[in-house]
A protein has these predicted regions:
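A general structural detector for well-ordered alpha-helical segments in enzyme core domains, enriched
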Residues: 2, 37, 41, 64-71, ...
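Conserved, mostly hydrophobic/aromatic
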Residues: 6, 18, 45, 53, ...
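N-terminal binding-site loop/beta-alpha segment at the start of enzyme catalytic domains
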Residues: 1-80, 143
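Structural motif corresponding to the early beta-alpha repeats
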Residues: 59, 75-94, 119
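Short beta->alpha linker loops
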Residues: 59, 63, 155-156, 254
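Glycine/proline-rich, positively charged
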Residues: 24-27, 89-207, 214-221, 227-228, ...
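Short catalytic-loop micro-motif centered on adjacent basic/acidic residues
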Residues: 52-59, 148-152, 174-175, 248-250
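Structured C-terminal cap/extension of enzyme domains
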Residues: 46, 51, 70, 167-169, ...
Length: 276
């Protein structure tokens, strides 16, 4: 598994991260996790060098944190990076930030989070993050060793990102980035803003929720003609991972076939060429 060093810390992060928003479910209706099948995915990920596991308070109706904390419990704590996020829309008063954070530690059965994010920042809710002192509290948790690195995930326009980046000091940021959204959702400019400020980039939605695994018949034919031995999804993963300021690419893998394909892509990683 290809790894990249986080800043100058010496910490090596797998370039493929396991996103825990689309784990196997017991049925197509609802969000209940199929714990047995999901555990198989986590075990395969760990065995193949994935050491970055991204969850959130709200994923799978609140089950995701509890699941991934339990799934990783059998492995040495210093061999993986556990990541979760603060849902500011669940906060009604300052005290709620601390209450939710402590609940997350309990959910995940850990004493600290390796990477922690202010979740889904946009122009409107950034005011709430400021009002409720979320950054200040989370910075205190960082000082106490309960958070190693503090960042944010983002869903808005580039000028909003510039304001967010310049208001506080961030260790990393997570954005939606893929070859469709590079222009359409301003991912290019968002990526540049982070790169200009020396903020490492975590990529979410590299395959755009599966859309880029089967974009259209004409595109599929071009991909298969160029590399008949590679999956169509692998092109999207490689696109994101080829950018120099990307630390890891998150993929929500809901079955073993998907994770095997992505692991193969990142174990024998080939950056995109000009011809590609």
């Amino acid at each position: 598994m290809l790894k990249r060093t986080y800043k100058d810390t010496g910490l090596e992060i797998s370039t493929l991260g396991l996103g825990c928003m689309r784990l196997p479910k017991v049925s197509t209706e609802g969000e209940e996790i199929d714990f047995e099948k999901a555990q198989e995915i986590v075990d395969y990920a760990y065995a193949n060098g994935i050491n970055y596991y991204d969850t959130a308070y709200i994923y799978h109706g609140g089950q995701s944190e509890e699941f991934i904390g339990g799934a990783l419990k059998k492995y040495p704590r210093d061999t993986y990076n556990l990541v979760t996020k603060m849902p500011i829309w669940r906060v009604e008063k300052k005290e709620d930030v601390e209450q939710i954070f402590n609940e997350q530690l309990k959910n995940c059965q850990v004493e600290y989070f390796d990477f922690y994010l202010c979740h889904a920042i946009n122009e409107d809710n950034f005011k709430q993050y400021i009002e409720y002192g979320a950054y200040e509290f989370l910075s205190k948790m960082k000082e106490e060793g309960k958070i190693r690195y503090l960042g944010f995930s983002f869903h808005d326009k580039p000028h909003v990102m510039e304001n967010v980046c310049d208001t506080y000091k961030w260790d990393f940021a997570q954005i939606q980035l893929n070859y469709l959204d590079w222009e359409m959702q301003d991912a290019k400019r968002q990526y540049e803003i982070l790169e200009e400020r020396g903020i490492p980039c975590i990529v979410m939605e590299p395959v755009r929720g599966g859309v880029l695994a089967n974009p259209c018949e004409a595109s599929n034919e071009l991909f298969k003609e160029a590399r008949p031995d590679k999956s169509i999804a692998s092109w999207a993963i490689r696109y994101a991972a080829s950018l120099p300021n990307v630390l890891t690419v998150l993929s929500g893998m809901s079955n073993l076939d998907q994770i095997k394909d992505n692991v193969e892509t990142m174990t024998h990683f080939e950056p995109l060429t000009e011809k590609d």
